Amino acid sequence: MDVASECNIKVICRVRPLNEAEERAGSKFILKFPTDDSISIAGKVFVFDKVLKPNVSQEYVYNVGAKPIVADVLSGCNGTIFAYGQTSSGKTHTMEGVLDKPSMHGIIPRIVQDIFNYIYGMDENLEFHIKISYYEIYLDKIRDLLDVTKTNLAVHEDKNRVPFVKGATERFVSSPEEVMEVIDEGKNNRHVAVTNMNEHSSRSHSVFLINVKQENVETQKKLSGKLYLVDLAGSEKVSKTGAEGAVLDEAKNINKSLSALGNVISALADGNKSHVPYRDSKLTRILQESLGGNARTTMVICCSPASYNESETKSTLLFGQRAKTIKNVVSVNEELTADEWKRRYEKEKERVTKLKATMAKLEAELQRWRTGQAVSVEEQVDLKEDVPAESPATSTTSLAGGLIASMNEGDRTQLEEERLKLYQQLDDKDDEINNQSQLIEKLKEQMMEQEDLIAQSRRDYENLQQDMSRIQADNESAKDEVKEVLQALEELAMNYDQKSQEVEDKNKENENLSEELNQKLSTLNSLQNELDQLKDSSMHHRKRVTDMMINLLKDLGDIGTIVGGNAAETKPTAGSGEKIEEEFTVARLYISKMKSEVKTLVSRNNQLENTQQDNFKKIETHEKDLSNCKLLIQQHEAKMASLQEAIKDSENKKRMLEDNVDSLNEEYAKLKAQEQMHLAALSEREKETSQASETREVLEKQMEMHREQHQKQLQSLRDEISEKQATVDNLKDDNQRLSLALEKLQADYDKLKQEEVEKAAKLADLSLQIDRREQAKQDLKGLEETVAKELQTLHNLRKLFVQDLQNKVKKSCSKTEEEDEDTGGNAAQKQKISFLENNLEQLTKVHKQLVRDNADLRCELPKLEKRLRATMERVKSLESALKDAKEGAMRDRKRYQHEVDRIKEAVRQKNLARRGHAAQIAKPIRPGQHQSVSPAQAAAIRGGGGLSQNGPMITSTPIRMAPESKA
């Protein structure tokens, strides 16, 4: 390929299958493939060099798109392969694939293996030097993936105005395994992120450069070829990817650089524009030779077939269609020998001599025209014959060499020195800029780390402040609680002191009353003794009265028999009337008292019975609702079963329709075969052409009608299935809602049952209280009977006293004064007894009240003591929690400081390790070398796998003292 040749950019369209997310979302496959090199979307057809369907293998993609470039690169030409498309369209899968599975390898690992296999089959007199570089364009900055300290590399141009990345790390390799190790190393340093459309979305454009230099050891002919393998980041629509924060900034830069790439391709495809905006982004600067320059370029446009991404897919196809019109001029990159330069110099010198002679003729002809002379056609200079045609192989470099050779030796030496000096100054300035940028990046990283540490410290400090404020608030609230508890305790103590004082006062009063009671009791005893004496005397009088009454009755009987009067029955009748009145009064008081208590108990019992009836009614209603809910659930389950059967019937119908479609397709195939047979016969019978075409149109219309009916039936079945599914979902929702209602009703039922149990317990307690009241009533009744008996005894004594006094009045009038004195003494004794009874009753009431107050205080005292203990425990727990929080904060602070120190030490050690790169030695490899030979023996292996008899050829191996390479 000594002569430059034009060629278009080769564009291959690859369509990936629908992914799981698109299938779940219901996206449809909208792309169609009319032929192997065309694709259509929404009725518009795009033609490319090759269209790859979703089911093609990685090996087929490589064989179609990348394998032909290997021979061109090893023949001294430049090559470029890059993937373009929206995010999640399969670009990284196409370029890299799955490195762990050989069957899923992408273009990069396969082309690396193929390059070495091609080298092993070439002439053994050829010696190769292979260098690789791997960098990414992240946030419009070139970042070295093999040395992450180089974060802002610059793009320069060499003497032939070819752009290159200055300062990028170059690794010399001699086997595919070494290349794969470098790829793994760079891939681990590449920026990736998670978006809504892709779990491993590339956030940068990666460029993998393979620089192959070869030299024929016999003819000293040197060729060089560069292979750019570019994995572009996908264009993103933020509304779909959900990018935010740093990911959003990355998306902006990605879309900006891809927009610049689109502008370059549009300008190159137009052909009329004089300016191509290569300098709008670093991506287009690096790909300048690949787009409209000296390179054989293959572009793989990756498309998504989903209807969800229809607009992005159209944009990608239009991009590929424009890129297909770009023409590159491919020429061999050859370093000429001295003889070749000399031959070209002589050729150019001869050409310049002819040009000078032609110029002299033209000047003479022009002079004649200016003087007004006419120049005949035969005498006019023919430029087509006289001007020698420029050789297509003549490059601007050779022309410049010829012009420099035409200068004198001094000017040429001075120009060469100035050029070298300028290049040296440019290199020094680039080194200085690179060092400054690296220093700036390091300082930025340190500042970012410090800012992160400060932000983390601020967040920790804010969290600690919040914890401290929360703990202080808890402490304040605890203090308030303690104060309230202490105040309550003080009030309780004061109340307790007051109650104690009151109890002491009451006890003193009780003691005083007890003393008074004792005195009253002693007085009562004395009175009782006197009463006993009176009883004895009354008994004595009673006997006497009895005797006298017997005698009197006898006398009265005798008198009654004689007279027949009722005077003797008057007093007993009056006495019995007084007794009945007193007993009625006592019974009436007791009955009125018990009546009020019984009324209250009856009303309380009625309320409880009403509440119980209401509860029973609620339970019955809830049981009815529960049974209704169970019935509804059974009905819905039956409906669900019927709907499932309907769905199964729909599926069967769908299968039957699919079988019908298959049968129709078979009939269509048969009809098509018959049609072909008819077409074969048409060549012999031209008269039947119209009839056959009409038959064909009728058949096509019938097939179209069948297809439309089938589509309608399928659509109706899908709609019916979706409706059934919606109905099933609604029934499931209703079932779940009814289940929740059932659970709620069951909970309410359990709650009512619990309330019923509690009320039954309360009713039992009330019944027990009623029984106790009945028992107390019986006891009180017995007491009343005893009191009634005592009153009856006193009444009898009073009657006896009255009778005795009457008898004494009758017997002796002389003893009237004495009887009057006795009657006055008895009245005084009765008054004294009633006074003592009243005092005793008051003392009993006071004693009972004191006992009740003491019992209430004793009941309140344990509650207050329990509350005091709970408050003290709460205070102790808050104090321990505060202490634990302080200790935890101290531990977290120490651990955080230790972690920061450890990270700083690790970063420092890592920086030291990065600075300690050892010197690299380029390892030339020879064709015929076996793949399994170790790199240490690679320099001495020749064709056939045998070792060279002259030992390893180290003379051609350049020694590099640093990992960077300069242009």
Swiss-Prot record:
InterPro entries: Kinesin-like_fam (IPR027640), Kinesin_motor_CS (IPR019821), Kinesin_motor_dom (IPR001752), Kinesin_motor_dom_sf (IPR036961), P-loop_NTPase (IPR027417)
Keyword ATP-binding: yes
Pfam families: Kinesin
Region (Globular): 862-967
GO molecular function: ATP binding; microtubule binding; microtubule motor activity
Region (Microtubule-binding), start-end ranges: 173-314
Ranges of biased composition (kind: Polar residues): 949-958
Domain Kinesin motor: 8-326
PROSITE patterns: KINESIN_MOTOR_1 (PS00411), KINESIN_MOTOR_2 (PS50067)
Domain of life where this protein originates: Eukaryota
Intracellular or extracellular location(s): Cytoplasm, Cytoskeleton; Cell projection, Axon
Keyword annotations of the record: ATP-binding, Cell projection, Coiled coil, Cytoplasm, Cytoskeleton, Microtubule, Motor protein, Nucleotide-binding
Region (Disordered): 387-411, 923-967
Chain sites annotated for binding ATP: G85, Q86, T87, S88, S89, G90, K91, T92
Record-level GO cellular component terms: axon; cytoplasm; microtubule
UniProt comment concerning the protein's domains: Composed of three structural domains: a large globular N-terminal domain which is responsible for the motor activity of kinesin (it hydrolyzes ATP and binds microtubule), a central alpha-helical coiled coil domain that mediates the heavy chain dimerization; and a small globular C-terminal domain which interacts with other proteins (such as the kinesin light chains), vesicles and membranous organelles.
Role summary: Kinesin is a microtubule-associated force-producing protein that may play a role in organelle transport.
Subunit structure, interactors included: Oligomer composed of two heavy chains and two light chains. Interacts with amyloid-beta precursor-like protein (via cytoplasmic domain).
Family per similarity comment: Belongs to the TRAFAC class myosin-kinesin ATPase superfamily. Kinesin family. Kinesin subfamily.
Record protein name field: Kinesin heavy chain
Organism, scientific name: Doryteuthis pealeii
